Design a protein with these regions (language model features):
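Short, charged beta-turn/beta-strand-edge "cap" motif at the junction between a beta-strand
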Residues: 16-19
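Ferredoxin-like alpha/beta domains used as RNA- or RNAP-binding modules
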Residues: 1-7, 14, 24-89
Length: 89
């Protein structure tokens, strides 16, 4: 089963050394991978490539997703703040 993620989705890592950490999907890659970032450990300039099988979607950050889709600049501080203040976590 292939999971369909969108830009701005809030995900929890279920496998690996980053298990139970919360991230946002910042880019969709081919072959069942997405690039995730949290603005701190994995900044937007160096997102982590993660297999979608190892992620669980728990919500969506609309403002971040809209900015990423339109190509507008998103800052690490903005992403980190959005993840912290969302009522998802």
């Amino acid at each position: 089963m292939v999971k369909n993620f969108e830009l701005g989705d809030v995900v929890v890592s279920q496998k690996g050394r980053d298990a139970q950490m919360v991230f946002a999907v910042v880019q969709i890659d081919k072959d069942g991978f997405v690039l995730i970032a949290d603005g701190e450990i994995h900044p937007l300039k160096k997102p982590k490539k993660k297999n979608v099988k190892h992620l669980k979607c728990i919500g969506k950050l609309e403002t971040i997703g809209n900015k990423l889709t339109s190509g507008a600049k998103v800052f690490d501080s903005e992403l980190k703040s959005a993840l912290r203040t969302s009522k998802i976590i």
